[in-house]
Amino acid sequence: MKDEEFKKAIDFYRALIEKEISDEKIVDGRLVGPRKLRKDDPVDLKDIIHPERPFFDKDVADDLDPLYVTTFRVGNLKKPLSMGKTGYGTDIIAGMELGTKLVKNGFIKSFDEIAAFLAKYKMGILDVFKEEEIENGKMLDLRIYECIECSELPNVGEPICYFETGIIIGILKELTHKEVLAEEKRCWASGYSFCQYDVVIRD
């Protein structure tokens, strides 16, 4: 993705986010976005296949982006709701292992290279929305737009991107050699058009 398109994507989604957050509510103790909640219906195959990702669609010829995403999801997102309760630990650990190896094998050498890597491999558009120093560390508000795992999934009332959470932890832990905590706070699957991760890097 070219720098100009990357910036357009960030600007577009930041404007959208402001409205979505102003319309959010709390359901069962979780933040839920404005899209209609479909909590009692299972996520089925038609929800998983052929999603539209406006900025990545422009970046790939011949309608290949939806096929790329579908292939990933059929392998990784076979049962998002059932795995949400029982398999999230496995997904986080798998993501952490991948994130660690991406750094160890030289695919990502610095914090500034993370966004370019995720965009190149069509995993998502990373926006470092906020960064602040806290006692004994640093806090990051990371947002991912057009996420390969959840973009255009229905609102099931809870975040599901455990694998991506693990990737973030693995990359940052290996880059900083510090304790890293991350939690997905908002997600396509909880009614938004983005994923938000609260990240703490402890000194």
Model-derived segments and spans:
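Active-site helix/loop of acyl-thioester processing domains in fatty-acid/polyketide metabolism
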Residues: C161-H177
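N-terminal accessory segment detector
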Residues: M1-I160, L181, R186-Q196, I201-D203
